[in-house]
Amino acid sequence: MNTLFMHCRPGFEGEVCSEISDLAARLNVAGYAKAKPATACAEFVCTEEDGAERLMRGQRFAELIFPRQWARGFFIDLPENDRISVILAHMSEFPVCGSLWLEVVDTNDGKELSNFCKKFEGPLRKALTGAGKLVEDTSKPRLLLTFKSGREVFLGLADAGNSAMWPMGIPRLKFPREAPSRSTLKLEEAWHHFIPRDQWEDRLHSDMTGVDLGAAPGGWTWQLVNRGMLVTAIDNGPMAESLMDTGLVQHLMADGFTFKPKQPVDWMVCDIVEKPARNAAMLEEWIGEGHCREAVVNLKLPMKQRYAEVKRLLERIADGFKARGIKVDIGCKQLYHDREEVTCHLRRLDVKKAKAR
């Protein structure tokens, strides 16, 4: 099991290779990363048998930026018939697993395998259970089968608590018809990724206030309003009338980069298309100057050296807060609903929080 297999957004295979190579160097795990363009996946092949396991034990998956999912294991070839027997034979040295996910890569070829996986899962689950290799137990490893085709599969393991919360790392979020734009799903996914679900009532509630910079027409504002917050929407463009009719939104025609609230707010969100360094500096200022307690800001990525640029900006933000003596939790992820961008979440840890009713 010396290969670490990772899913990603098509076109970002190189960023995954760079990021995982950085991690391997930090953890002294020898090996090499490889990927083909536009395949929506990458691998890190370890020279030592326990290398992939050491990578996974040494890193919280949620803190990786570009990988959507990961698993340690190996590829196997499957015959046209009796695939299950071959899979069971290769699992002889696998531990008993607590859950089973069948996955495909996020490409057109991968999506064509979805129906096959749906039909195959039932018989495979039954066979694994009968062989004593699968039980219902979240404390045990998750068995992840990623099909590259009907004849090739990556047989992998991952800790259910240290891997993606959805199969392939793709959330199943329903677009709310009342929201004025599909960008609303970006902020909802960000909350799922950065905020544990059992903390939503404490950190996203109706006694809170928020600011949406570059708000029009209101996709992100809608998420704040849906949690009952009072929102100041900053944009020179028009906001959706349905949002204004809620009575929870104040729309100010102003520049998102120069606006500052008169009183501190709980949340600042921003999806302005601008150079990433400028958005990062604004994010650091809002948190550092105490204008907000938590923030979600998108950083649009350059055409080249995307991982290097994100890493540089995150280090600059972290160094800035360290110099100020401010305690901040910093997260960054390329979400499923992101395109040529990543989403940053910052939470100031040394200020009092608003209490839910």
UniProtKB/Swiss-Prot annotation:
Disulfide bonds: none annotated. It is found in: Cytoplasm. GO terms for molecular function: S-adenosylmethionine-dependent methyltransferase activity. Monomer. S-adenosyl-L-methionine binds at residues 183, 216-219, 235, 255, 271. It comes from Pseudomonas fluorescens (strain Pf0-1). The active site is at residue 300. This is Ribosomal RNA large subunit methyltransferase M. The keyword Cytoplasm applies. Transmembrane segments: none annotated. SUPFAM superfamilies: S-adenosyl-L-methionine-dependent methyltransferases (SSF53335). HAMAP family: 23SrRNA_methyltr_M. Belongs to the class I-like SAM-binding methyltransferase superfamily. RNA methyltransferase RlmE family. RlmM subfamily. It is an enzyme of class 2 (transferase). Its EC number is 2.1.1.186. It catalyses: cytidine(2498) in 23S rRNA + S-adenosyl-L-methionine = 2'-O-methylcytidine(2498) in 23S rRNA + S-adenosyl-L-homocysteine + H(+). GO terms for biological process: methylation; rRNA processing. Catalyzes the 2'-O-methylation at nucleotide C2498 in 23S rRNA. GO terms for cellular component: cytoplasm. The keyword Cytoplasm applies. Coiled coil: none annotated.
